[in-house]
Amino acid sequence: MEELKPTKKSPLATLTNAELAIEKIMVMAKVRLKHLERHRTTCPDTKELLHRIEPIDNWLVRRMESYIEANPAYWWFSHVKGAGRELMSKLIGEIEGFGRYYDVGDPEIPPYVKREPEEYIILDEDGNEIVKKGIWVEGIERLTTPSKLRAYAGKAPGRKPQKGAKLTYNARLKMLTHRLEKSFMQARGSFYTFYGGYKDYLEDRVTTKDGKKVMPTPKARYCPQCDKEVEVKRARYCPDCGGQLSQKTEPPGIIYKGHVHQMAQHRMGQLFLDLLWHVWRESLGLPVREPYPVEKQEHTSIIRPEDMMDKSCGKKDCPICHGKDFERRQNESY
């Protein structure tokens, strides 16, 4: 039998797909055990399932983290507070998973992709293998503009679930971007500083331009069945009757602080995706473009990727931080 050689293609997309699937199973198993524990019971099979898949999940995370260093944008996001290795490996894996084969001569193939056609296998509806020939286009190569990455991540206007229609974005990438936003909030780094400034700008804009008043978000939500207000933070159903709670609707002329917070956090996530797109493509020598405000609206100020670098990657041989604290190193006179 012919000995097969290891492929040079990164398996990060495949590993990410497997890890996120196992993560979902682990969460379901833990929730089930927690629920049974409240009723003073347990399930040995669920415990055994968790015991068997946790080592696989740990192995997947370690392998994903080892591959993330090969990403062309690693030099940048490894110096950003809140962009942890595990989270970034999943996010990058989802973007890499956007790559696909195109038929030779397909007009959708970007002009800068010069790869030779190669054979690949697909399965038909009956599970039979079909050998085809096509040109491979990487995920970041397909995302020709920053707005396309935003749209793919569900961070563009109108990218919401529609009843009876297929999603127009990658739900898992949107979830991972939301996790990253939460991580930035906790890290209190450059992106958190941007969030704070943009939040102040939004509050000033809605009060001076739109004439609205910014009010604290009410804790209570109304239950029609119980005919009362219920104080819950994230629940959708009444803890007493189980009925669905009403949404928190803003009265005319009022905008809740929670709404402003979500808008600012959303913009922070968009900024990261824009900068990641720019660094990744520029490092590969792919065409890049200036941000929309600069290119179309003639703005003069711009946030560069280097402006958001605020931590050490921990490696002494790093040509950027030399293993030193990034903030302290910037204050040194040399």
Predicted regions and their residues:
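A basic, often C-terminal nucleic-acid-binding module that engages the phosphate backbone, implemented
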Residues: G127-E129, I135, G139, S147-R234, ...
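Catalytic DNA-binding helix-loop module of base-excision-repair DNA glycosylases/AP lyases
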Residues: P72-A73, G82-E118, G127, K133-R142, ...
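Post-HExxH zinc-binding segment in Zn-dependent metallohydrolases
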Residues: D124
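Helix-hairpin-helix/helix-loop-helix acidic hairpins
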Residues: K30-E86, E94-F98, Y102, P110, ...
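Phosphate- and other anionic-substrate recognition elements at nucleic-acid/protein interfaces
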Residues: M1-R38
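Generic structural signal for well-ordered, non-transmembrane alpha-helical segments
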Residues: A13, L20-V27, K47, H51-N58, ...
